Amino acid sequence: MPSIGLLSLGCPKNLVDSEVMLGLLRENNFTITNNEANADALIVNTCGFIESAKEESIRHIFELAQYKERGKCKALIVTGCLAQRYSKELLEEIPEIDVILGPGHVSNIVEVVNHALEGKDRHTRVEDLLYIYDEHSPRLLSTPSYTAYVKIAEGCDNRCAYCAIPDIRGKFRSRPIESIEAEVKDLVEKGVREIILIAQDTTRYGLDLYGEYRLDQLLERLGPIQGLQWIRLLYCYPNRFTDQLIKAMAENPNICKYIDLPMQHAANDILRAMKRPVTKQQARILIQKLRTEIPGIVIRTSFIVGFPGETEEHFKELLDFMEEVKFDRAGVFTYSQEEGTPAAEMPNQIHGRIKQERYHRAMKLQREISLSQNQKRIGQEIEVVVEEVTDQSKGVYTGRSSYDAPEIDGTVEFTSSRPLRIGDFVKVKINRALEYDLMGELAQ
C-alpha cells in the first residue's frame, strides 16, 4: 500500500485533526512514515492564525514540495487553517500542490489522497465547515503514550477584532457529553493517564447543544473514570468561568489545579477595541475567586501587545496588572495585522519596533514574576510525570508537573535513587527554582 507522511503545524486543536487523518489512513491500509523521502504522498496540516505561523506553513509546504522532484512523492496535500483561508492563492501559486483540504473535510482524507495519487485534477475542498470528529473516529496518537488531547468542540462564535478563526473554523459546535466520555474511557483503556480538554473556547462548551454551559457537568462525568490521573483545561474565556465550573474543579481531585485563561490585555479601552467581553475588574474578581476556592491553583494567561491604538499608558496599565495579579505563567505576543479582521482596518497601527520593545518589557517582568512564583515551590512535594531519562547513570530524570501543560510550560528535573519509567507519576520534593523550570529529588 502507498506510504503517507504528515507534518502537523500549529496548535493542539490542529494536532487532533492530524491524528484523526492518520487514523483514517492507517485504517484504510496506508503505511505511515516519518521519512518524507520515502512517502508516496505528503500532507501538511497548516496553521494560519498569525503572520509568523503563515510564513512557517508556507516554508514547510515548499520544503515538502521538493520531494516531488528528489523523492518518491507523487501527491502533496495541504490541509488546515492556512488551506481554508488561502485555498485559491495556494493552488495558483504553488503548482506542486495537488489538493487543498479545509478543516471541515478531515473525514475525506482517504478519498482525497487516493484521488491525488491517481493523478486526477488539482482541486480545493473548503466549502463545508460543519465537521467535528467523534468517539468512533480512529486516531493515531502522536503525543507520548500517557497523554492525549481531546477536542470537546470545534469552531468559534467569538468575534474578537484581531482573529480570523471564526471564518476559518466555522460556528462553535460542541460534541455530546456521552461522545467525549466514551472517547476518554477508550483512551484511558489504551494507557493514557492525562487528558487535556481543548476547544477554541472550552468554557462555552455545551451552550449550542444544551442551551447552557456544561463544562462543569462534563468534568463531573470524566472525574470518576478509573485510571485517569490528570484532567487539564486549556483555552478558557474569563467571562464564561461559572461558579459551577469552579466548584467542579475544586471537588474533583484528578482535575489539575491549573487553568489557561487568555486575558489578551488589561486596559479596558483596549479590551473593548479587541471586542473581548470582559473588564479588568471582572478579571480581577475571577482570579481572586479562583485562588480562594481552589487553593494553590496555577493560572496561565496570554497577552497581546501593540494592538492598534495601544498607548504607552495602556501598556503601563497592562504591566501594572501583571505586577498586581502575578500570573504564574504568561505568554506575550505582538499584535499581528490579519487581513479580513476588523483590527486590520483600525487607525493608529503600532510600529513594529514599538511592538517588539513592549514585548521584551512585558516578558522581562513576567520572567521576574515566574521566578518569584516558582520559588514558593521550594520545599513542596508536587506530582510529576516522568517524560525523559536525562542521565540513567546518575539517576537524573526530566518530567512535567500537574501545574504544567506540554510544550508551553516548564519542566521538573529531579534525581531518583530507584529506576523510573517514562510515564510514571511520582512525587518530587522541590529544592531549586528557575524562571520557568524546577529542580528536586524523588520524595521519600
Curated annotation (Swiss-Prot):
Positions bound to [4Fe-4S] cluster 2: 156, 160, 163
Gene3D superfamilies found in the cross-reference section: Methylthiotransferase, N-terminal domain, Nucleic acid-binding proteins, tm_1862 like domain
A Pfam family of this chain: UPF0004
Protein role: Catalyzes the methylthiolation of an aspartic acid residue of ribosomal protein uS12.
The protein's name: Ribosomal protein uS12 methylthiotransferase RimO
Similarity comment: family membership: Belongs to the methylthiotransferase family. RimO subfamily.
Entry-linked SUPFAM superfamilies: Radical SAM enzymes
Domain Radical SAM core: 142-372
Domain TRAM: from-to ranges: 375-444
Reactions the enzyme catalyzes: L-aspartate(89)-[ribosomal protein uS12]-hydrogen + (sulfur carrier)-SH + AH2 + 2 S-adenosyl-L-methionine = 3-methylsulfanyl-L-aspartate(89)-[ribosomal protein uS12]-hydrogen + (sulfur carrier)-H + 5'-deoxyadenosine + L-methionine + A + S-adenosyl-L-homocysteine + 2 H(+)
Annotated GO biological process: tRNA modification
Naturally occurring in which organism (per UniProt): Desulforamulus reducens (strain ATCC BAA-1160 / DSM 100696 / MI-1)
Disulfide bonds: none
Entry keywords, A to Z: 4Fe-4S, Cytoplasm, Iron, Iron-sulfur, Metal-binding, S-adenosyl-L-methionine, Transferase
GO CC annotations, alphabetized: cytosol
Signal peptide location: none
Ranges of residues in domain MTTase N-terminal: 2-118
Residues involved in [4Fe-4S] cluster 1 binding: 11, 47, 81
MF term (GO), any: 4 iron, 4 sulfur cluster binding
Cofactor remark from the record: Binds 2 [4Fe-4S] clusters. One cluster is coordinated with 3 cysteines and an exchangeable S-adenosyl-L-methionine.
Subcellular location, record wording: Cytoplasm
PROSITE patterns: MTTASE_N, MTTASE_RADICAL, RADICAL_SAM, TRAM
Cofactor(s) in the UniProt record: [4Fe-4S] cluster
EC numbers for this chain: 2.8.4.4
Keyword Ribonucleoprotein: no
InterPro entries hit by this protein: Elp3/MiaA/NifB-like_rSAM, Methylthiotransferase, Methylthiotransferase_CS, Methylthiotransferase_N, Methylthiotransferase_N_sf, NA-bd_OB-fold, Ribosomal_uS12_MeSTrfase_RimO, rSAM
